[in-house]
Amino acid sequence: MSRFLSNSDISRLNAAKLGQSVTLGMDSFDCLCRAKEMFGKTGGAFDISIGALYDCWLHEDRTLRQPSPTEIQHAHALTGLNHLELDEDGFCAEVLTEGLQFDLGGIGKGYAAEKVAEILREWSLGQALVLAGASSVLSVSVPEGMSGWPMKLRNPENPNEVLGRFELKEGAVSGSGRQKGQHIIDPRSVDVGPVKGRLAAWSVAPDAIAADASS
């Protein structure tokens, strides 16, 4: 599901022409459906069709560039999941605006964590904690005798400093931050570029996909 692999479903969708129907694997299609659901729930704040804005605002090493107003307007015209149509009967996707660039980075780890949890439940290993990298955690279930999995939220500028502690009983927690570059962009307005004010944000949600997309 990576846009950096030339033969992936997402890369094929990114290369699709206007009106072309692209048949996807079940996981890719399901992930796109959940992404579109979160797009609606967040009022467009979470948007996987943000690739054009990434290319507009960021160099390849994720350092900030200064695009012209024309570049910004063009990138915004190529952003928005309202430009993507999904066919649940045929597991197909069609882009309604040519040039859209999709990136599942904001939801992919959460989706993978949910798939791992499904397998663990099938194997009757429900008392487990799924770690998806350093930023997403999913509690499948808490072992008997525990009130919850101990969680720590650390200062992104000083990992030795613990900002908060809590116990995760059910659901997931996910975090996003700027320590690896200014890659967090609000796609809803042409007047807002990469986030500069806050260093990090965390989200707790009933499932890992919602937590990942909301953070």
Question: Model-flagged regions — what are they?
Answer:
Residues M1-S215:
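Mature catalytic core of soluble alpha/beta enzymes
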